Amino acid sequence: MKQSNRIVVYKSSTGFTKKYAEMIAERMECALADYRSVSADMLSGYDVVIFGTRVHAGMMDGYQKAKKLFEKSGVSRLILFVTGATPNAAAETVEAFWKQNLSSDELAKIPHFYMQSGLCYEKMSLADRLMMKVAAVMVKNKKNKTAQDIEFEQAIRSSYDISSIEYIEPLISYLNSLKD
């Protein structure tokens, strides 16, 4: 059954968020749009907007601008998902990320989901590649490395993809539980 009152909007830089957005839209049989092509007018025709973006330097890339757009559109329900290189198993790190990026009110009112994805140096901007290089040098030169430092150092050595369709399941379950 096509979910015509729902749309998945994504902001993707290296392709991971787009990949997950496409999986969600296909599974839920709903509309899909790149964030750069949407307007408040367009979104006003939907009851539910599922917004996906990447974690960039510990922040939700483009969320503040997107939030203003969603508020202007009058959409009744916003759902968030973010993609990042941090494994889903690092629950404390993911929880700290949400607390840093959403107000306590948003944490309570906006359903939010994290999906591990990966790193793709080949598709990163020059600025992002340089930022990763600096981070790698800083961790490499750090004395008394923690286990987390060592894991981070290994994780940023090269491109990798740890995304999987299984990571959309909590979001899909939530969407299926909604009474439209």
Predicted regions and their residues:
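FMN-binding flavodoxin-like domain, especially the glycine-rich phosphate-binding loop
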Residues: Q3-S4, G58-D180
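N-terminal beta1-alpha1-beta2 submodule of the flavodoxin-like/Rossmannoid cofactor-binding fold
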Residues: M1-V75, E169-D180
